[in-house]
Regions:
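Active-site-adjacent helical/loop segments in soluble small-molecule enzymes
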Residues: 20-76
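Glycine-rich phosphate/pyrophosphate-binding loop at beta-loop-alpha junctions
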Residues: 1-29, 66-114, 124
């Protein structure tokens, strides 16, 4: 048995530094393999279960789904027991947001535009032509000391995944806009 110095995870229902004295003998007798999963795998499992099965399962209860990605189960009948729905709405929202960002379905980019009428429209037309769905748009004239040098446009978009995200960014670049992906973690701010 190994004692951990700390147990920090979004799966707080199983975040223990030391296995319990009563449970450990059963685990030792009946478990033939253990896996170490990180929180990003739980976020992926949460989004999969929510989108595909329309279920809300707390993080500790998602461990079997996350573990399946590490096991060779093709062609086999496998049952994953999902348990627990003890999750507050803020946590749920955070998991969905992080999952969508990881999958390239939400992303933010910044671009410098000339400060003249029509610049924003040109970007909007490229986004529309490439099926980019705007979630948030910030047109900031005050980011540069000299407004004559341009304005900054930050756009948070919904996309279909990483390939679609790259298609949108490449379409902007092909039209002369130097679009740079930025941190999407604060897109609600």
């Amino acid at each position: 048995m190994i004692n951990l110095p700390a147990a920090t995870t979004i799966a707080d229902g199983v975040a223990v530094k030391t296995p319990g004295d009563k449970v450990f003998p059963y685990v030792q007798k009946n478990v033939d393999r253990t896996l170490v999963l990180d929180d990003s795998e739980l976020v992926e499992a949460f989004l999969d279960v929510m989108e595909r099965h329309k279920m809300v399962v707390e993080n500790a209860g998602l461990l079997p789904v996350a573990a399946l990605r590490h096991l060779d189960c093709r062609g086999k009948n496998v049952v994953s027991i999902l348990s627990g729905g003890n999750m507050d709405v803020i946590t749920m929202s955070s998991l969905v947001q992080h999952g969508l960002i990881r999958r390239g379905r939400i992303f933010t980019f910044a671009v410098q535009l000339p400060d003249r009428p029509g610049s924003l429209l040109a970007v909007a037309q490229i986004l529309a032509a490439n099926n980019g769905n705007v979630i948030k748009l910030e047109h900031n004239q005050f980011v540069n000391i000299n407004r004559q040098s341009g304005v900054e446009l930050r756009v948070t978009l919904e996309a279909f995944g990483h390939d679609h995200k790259e298609q949108i960014l490449n379409a902007l670049r092909a039209q002369g806009f130097h679009a740079v992906e930025t941190d999407t973690a604060d897109f609600y701010n």
